[in-house]
Regions:
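Vicinal oxygen chelate
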Residues: 2-4, 32-36, 43-46, 78, ...
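Core segments of cupin and vicinal oxygen chelate
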Residues: 3, 10-53
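Hydrophobic adenine-recognition pocket in adenosine-nucleotide-binding enzymes
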Residues: 9, 76, 80
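Short, charged/polar surface micro-motifs in flexible loops or helix N-caps
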Residues: 51-54, 63-65, 83-85
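A short, sequence-level motif marking secondary-structure junctions
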Residues: 61-64, 127
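A short, polar/proline- and glycine-enriched secondary-structure boundary/capping micro-motif
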Residues: 67-70
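Flexible, small-/acidic-enriched active-site or ligand-binding loops
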Residues: 73
Length: 127
């Protein structure tokens, strides 16, 4: 048996609908499926980019206080074929967005945008 591929990353969210709206508007993710478990007081929504298998799993636990992300988790990354355009779009939508940056001695090739729960997405220029 061998490992085949990455399936999803789970993000716990305070406001499920606001998070879905962010990932749809900011990156074009689409809701793939939703599972509600009222008896266990949580809902899971899987989002995916069209044609991609990797998903973001948004988990909403009913009545939970805002989550503390901590300092161990940094970010998820996504590729862009229009880095400048996406950076401008994210700023125009009012999202917390950094300017385009580069590693020391390198031209700008990435920036960060933050979702409603404080999770950061690194947007990287596609090669």
């Amino acid at each position: 048996m061998a490992i085949l591929n990455m399936l999803h990353a789970c993000l716990r969210v305070e406001n499920l609908e606001a998070s879905i709206e962010f990932y749809e508007k900011a990156f074009g993710f689409k809701e793939d499926r939703r599972m509600d478990y009222p008896e266990h007081k949580f809902t899971i929504v899987y989002l995916a980019l069209p044609g991609e298998h990797f998903e973001i799993e948004l988990t909403y636990n009913y009545g939970h206080r805002p989550y503390t992300i901590g300092d161990g988790f940094s970010h998820l990354a996504i590729a862009s074929d229009d880095l400048e355009g996406d950076n401008a779009k994210h700023k125009a939508l009012g999202y917390e967005t950094t300017d385009i940056k580069g590693l020391p001695g390198k031209p700008g090739h990435y920036y960060f945008v933050t979702d409603p729960d404080g999770y950061r997405m690194e947007v990287i220029r596609a090669k």
